[in-house]
């Protein structure tokens, strides 16, 4: 989602906090589960402190990131639609877990909504960057309307509106005004990457790969009625087998859904079949499942594939790469921001050579491998990767170097994943209560991937 993690100012102070001690080997299974839940709640409390300390009180907009070093904290005091959407869902999560009161949650989100109502937009869609101090447009990196980022803001608005009915009028008006048809290419049946307002041009590329994080924007666009349902079937499960640039030649068959032929292709890793993402990263695969009921409704497709990606991520990192911890996904590095993934899981897989592991990838796996998550968190804690605002953004598991940074996006993914695990999928429930989340559910149910 973020192709670059922009140059940082001075780096800031490590403020460490003790991670709740992990459960002992002799406790009962139920006792371990209860203790692990307590640990996750304690982690979520620290994680949400990021949004408490780094959200502008006047505008309700969260900072993009902070870095820490040598007694200084360097905040990135601009934000994106994705950051705002994750802030809303994190705030709902914090209230559901019991970290903040309902009144505080409503107040926080309402302040932010008032800023969004006045913010500059294009066909109701939000630009990529705004200053947190006043909600004004930030144009340092252009004037871009991002399909995927608007999708995550829409998701956050939908969740907030369902969690707090008194905010629903505001959230619904904002979502209704977001016209995704302007980003849709009916000739191809796919969403464009976005629109450059300055040059008045759509991106040349489309979001053609199905199993990536933009599928949330696609789902919402269909749920709103901005684009036709056939769009869901026009995305590639794998690229056609004749496209020889992809990392594997896919196997599979053609299935017809709603009159559209879909090549149900798959790749294979150590005899495990899966539908690939673009880069093989955890957040491409599992971030959409924070709001979409893929596990519950897509048992023969997305839900099963999510489990395969978790299993292969763990196997690839620990066995093939020989790392002591797993969780390969784009993350901050000591000097920048880079893309990492389990290379075989991607059509054009990101590298895993840097040995950079990011904690948000661990939390995203909670629904599919809680025991492995517990063990991995303990390993990451042993690297010293836990501080005042929860887990730092990444650690080099070969050198032990911890990237002393926190990103709003990654903090948000961790918060929502924990809330869904502790509160039985509460964020997904709120999303699917809305007609936009409910209307396309049949698309999740009816498909069967060729990985069964």
Predicted region positions:
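Short amphipathic alpha-helical "recognition" segments used for binding
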Residues: 6-7, 317
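Ser/Thr/Asn(+Pro)-rich, low-complexity disordered segments
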Residues: 26-452
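Sec-dependent signal peptide cleavage junction
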Residues: 17-28
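Bacterial N-terminal signal peptides
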Residues: 8-17
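Positively charged n-region of N-terminal signal peptides that target proteins for export
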Residues: 1-4
């Amino acid at each position: 989602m973020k192709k670059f993690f922009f140059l940082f100012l001075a780096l800031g102070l490590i403020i460490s906090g003790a991670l709740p001690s992990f459960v002992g080997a002799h406790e009962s299974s139920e006792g371990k589960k209860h203790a692990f839940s307590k640990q996750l709640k304690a982690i979520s409390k620290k994680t949400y402190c990021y949004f408490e300390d780094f959200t502008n009180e006047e505008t309700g907009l969260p900072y993009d990131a902070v870095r820490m070093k040598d007694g200084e904290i360097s905040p990135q005091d601009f934000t994106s639609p994705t950051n705002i959407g994750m802030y809303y869902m994190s705030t709902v999560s914090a209230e559901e877990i019991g970290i903040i009161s309902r009144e505080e949650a409503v107040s926080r989100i309402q302040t932010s909504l008032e800023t969004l109502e006045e913010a500059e937009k294009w066909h109701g869609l939000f630009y990529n960057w705004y200053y947190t101090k006043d909600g004004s447009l930030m144009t340092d990196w252009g004037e871009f309307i991002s399909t995927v980022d608007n999708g995550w803001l829409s998701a956050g608005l939908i969740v907030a509106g369902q969690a707090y009915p008194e905010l629903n009028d505001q959230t619904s008006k904002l979502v209704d005004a977001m016209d995704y048809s302007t980003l849709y290419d009916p000739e191809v049946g796919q969403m464009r990457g976005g629109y450059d307002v300055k040059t008045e041009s759509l991106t040349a590329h489309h979001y053609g790969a199905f199993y990536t994080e933009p599928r949330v924007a696609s789902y919402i666009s269909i749920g709103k009625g901005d684009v036709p349902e056939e769009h869901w079937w026009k995305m590639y499960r794998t690229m056609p087998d004749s496209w020889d640039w992809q990392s594997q030649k896919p196997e599979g068959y053609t299935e017809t859904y709603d009159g559209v032929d879909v090549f149900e292709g798959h790749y294979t890793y150590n005899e495990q079949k899966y539908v690939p993402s673009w880069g093989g990263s955890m957040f491409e695969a599992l971030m959409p499942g924070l709001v979409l009921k893929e596990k519950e409704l897509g048992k023969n497709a997305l839900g099963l594939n999510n489990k395969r990606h978790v299993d292969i991520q763990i196997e690839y990192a620990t066995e093939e790469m020989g790392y002591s911890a797993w969780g390969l996904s784009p993350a901050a590095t000591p000097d920048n921001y880079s893309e990492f993934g389990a290379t075989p899981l991607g059509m054009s897989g990101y590298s895993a050579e840097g040995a950079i592991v990011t904690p948000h990838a661990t939390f995203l796996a909670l629904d599919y491998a809680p025991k492995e998550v517990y063990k991995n968190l303990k390993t990451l804690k042993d690297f010293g990767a836990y501080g005042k605002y929860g887990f730092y953004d990444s650690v080099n598991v070969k050198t032990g170097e911890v990237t002393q940074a926190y990103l709003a996006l990654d903090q948000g993914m961790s918060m929502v994943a924990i809330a869904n695990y502790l509160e039985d999928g509460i964020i997904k429930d709120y999303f699917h209560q809305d007609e936009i989340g409910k209307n396309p559910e049949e698309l999740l149910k009816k498909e069967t991937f060729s990985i069964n």
